[in-house]
UniProtKB/Swiss-Prot annotation:
Pfam families: MinE. InterPro entries: MinE, MinE_sf. HAMAP family: MinE. It comes from Bordetella petrii (strain ATCC BAA-461 / DSM 12804 / CCUG 43448). One of its GO terms (biological process) is cell division. Keywords: Cell cycle, Cell division. It comes from the Bacteria. This is Cell division topological specificity factor. Prevents the cell division inhibition by proteins MinC and MinD at internal division sites while permitting inhibition at polar sites. This ensures cell division at the proper site by restricting the formation of a division septum at the midpoint of the long axis of the cell. The keyword Ribonucleoprotein does not apply. Belongs to the MinE family. Disulfide bonds: none annotated. NCBIfam families: minE (TIGR01215), PRK00296.1 (NF001422), PRK13989.1 (NF010595).
Amino acid sequence: MSFLSFLLGQKKTSAVVAKERLQIILAHERSGRGASPDYLPQLQQELVAVISKYVNINPDDIKVHLERQDTLEVLEVKIEMPQKEA
């Protein structure tokens, strides 16, 4: 039925969207907040690949850091851009 809804262009109700978001949050919470983020090195490599398409950068100029404080997680990405030539 959802495939038919997709073809007909029916929009999801706000209840369905909220349910999907809650499921994502619960899955994240259940996966273990204390576990080390093993996806950060791959994320950094992919960021280097994407940014390198547009700007010539050194891979060491991109830093990815995950910080946890109580119930809040902050993903910080620092990108040092090359100086623009005059």
